[in-house]
Amino acid sequence: MSKRDYYEVLGVGRDASEREIKKAYKRLAMKFHPDRNPGDKAAEASFKEAKEAYEILTDTDKKAAYDQFGHAGVDPNRGGGYGGGQGDFGDIFGDVFGDIFGGGRRGGQRQAARGSDLRYNLELSLEEAVKGLTKELRIPTLATCDLCDGSGAKKGTSASTCTTCHGQGQVQMRQGFFTVQQPCPTCHGRGKIIKDPCSKCHGDGRVEKSKTLSVKIPAGVDTGDRIRLAGEGEAGEFGAPPGDLYVQVSVREHAIFVRDGNNLYCEVPISFSKAALGGEIEVPTLDGKVSLKIPAETQTGRMFRLRGKGVKSVRSHAVGDLLCKVVMETPVNLNDRQKELLREFEATLTGESKKHSPKAEGFFDGVKKFFQDLNS
């Protein structure tokens, strides 16, 4: 008899998350569990089928092999697919003997799992990142069920001792000449069975819920920084500790400033006359406009440093600088009078290029020499 597709068994799509797979399995396990269906062979078969599907689809390597090769990829009796290559021996023996010998434990119940860590991607403006602020974040998570207080059992009831392992969480099995232990297949190592599950969480002890957190973002954070909020992740299983929440920061590009560490860069346009004669211009900073003195004969591309006008370091008391690059703009949309004045000005420079434009004169002298050498 051919096996059913594992995704079909659990009633989930192929793009289902691990949480969705786990939720589907728990629903089926509750429905077909042998303790709830004594003597029902069909229910027992359905329970085993769901358990097998769950174990494959929650194991990263086995799931990848199954997705690629189907059942052949996870069948240890066939070559190719999963287990057919030269994998890591530590992983292979850990997978095989971990189940046989109880995962290295000397008996005892499986400990309830700690809650999963969560990640929240937070995008900030440059101003928010530089100055810091408090953000209200809405986090979807798994929270402890308030109806059963996380026990998973119906209110007024409690989990009962597993009749298969008698509360030990482990069972002994004969393997050739050896007697070995493995997690109890009935209670999955917990030692207890929930016969009357909570109507709200359906025996999981946790429910999907959104919570709002006020998170203080320190001044000076940058793209790639991560803020850890201990205990704000998903609730743990049956009273186990919760996971943590990690807020991953990214900073949007700014229309004026470019950030490099604690320094800021910007380009400031200046007129031809201002560059030649000098004067004062207004430049933007994150704290408002400031005056910058431009000396006469300033060339385009010159960099001016405004100390302490950058970003305060999030890890020290150091403060970066603002570096302003002045870029001379060529005047446009000139009227006839303005064009005439420029021609008059140009005429006054004739024969004095070395005096007024030494770089240009040197450049053209170099070009002239290049062609002379080329033709000699």
Swiss-Prot record:
Top-rank taxon, per record: Bacteria
Zinc finger (CR-type) stretch: 132-210
Q: Where does Zn(2+) 2 bind?
A: C162, C165, C184, C187
User: What are the entry keywords?
Assistant: Chaperone, Cytoplasm, DNA replication, Metal-binding, Repeat, Stress response, Zinc, Zinc-finger
> Per UniProt, what is one Pfam family of this protein?
DnaJ_CXXCXGXG
Every copy of the J domain together lies at: 5-70
Q: Where are the CXXCXGXG motif repeats?
A: 145-152, 162-169, 184-191, 198-205
Keyword presence, Metal-binding: yes
Name the coenzymes or cofactors required.
Answer: Zn(2+)
> How is the cofactor bound here?
Binds 2 Zn(2+) ions per monomer.
Residues where Zn(2+) 1 binds = C145, C148, C198, C201
GO BP annotations of the record are:
chaperone cofactor-dependent protein refolding; DNA replication; protein refolding; response to heat
Q: Which GO terms describe its cellular component?
A: cytoplasm
UniProt key word Cell inner membrane: no
Q: How does it assemble?
A: Homodimer.
* Protein name as catalogued: Chaperone protein DnaJ
This chain's source organism reads Shewanella sp. (strain W3-18-1)
